[in-house]
């Protein structure tokens, strides 16, 4: 059946998060959407890929699928290195994959970096993006998050920082312990 969000495009441009973050543009290609989301916390646009559910005729949950160390700007992505896109295309879930923030550990940095700029990724994932996704895509409000490599550590921190926000959090090949000497070396 036709996806009412894609057909009407009525919700895609409307939502604004409490801090002023918003969807500034969208491209639609069948079941795939490419959104540009303005992050007020980082003062820049973030590309967000969305794969709509197999059956989008009713609200569906969201899986935030987070790329590894390169933030999806490299070739080490979920889509390029796994068949997760094909697998999830047959499921009734919105798959949301932000791109950007290479080697930023997807945390909120205390200071801006001369090379990487302002990094407020935890704010983006916990405060800015979810209300936009829920409103724009008409979701159920149920969400999970999964990440690999460097970002796997971050998604575990998100689940700790905001208990109950995600119905599930999965970390693959991450460095979950960052307070011992080995973990501190990874954080440098």
Residue locations for each model-derived region?
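Non-catalytic cap/lid and distal C-terminal segments of serine-dependent acyl enzymes
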Residues: 1-188
